[in-house]
Amino acid sequence: MCLVHDLGEAYEGDIPAVEQSDPAAKAAAELAAIDRITPLLPDEAAARIRALWEEYEACATPEARWVKALDKAETILQHNQGANPADFDYGFNLTYGAEWFRDDALLRELRRLLDAETARHVRR
């Protein structure tokens, strides 16, 4: 499911989290990418990829919610450990995707660690 989610970004790229303003447009662009890729595959594989992408987008299963949380965690890690503009607002990380970490003890602990790392950047 993680890889299938990233397939949706194959043509448009991954829009930086701080620049995302229209989730519906982003989802539509990603679905268009899935629709360009899947006809190249055998029918069964194409159907499975489409189903996984839809499951991720709906976030209706525990697996999809985990993948969504991990996708948000990866973004926060990039912000905390990568090169950012001097004026980057690390405070953004403290709320970004927080709702996806609430329903699972392990995800809550991951979020606590990410927030602690972010807080060190905020204090700089």
Regions found by a protein language model. Name each.
Residues 1-124:
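Active-site helical microenvironments for divalent-metal-assisted chemistry
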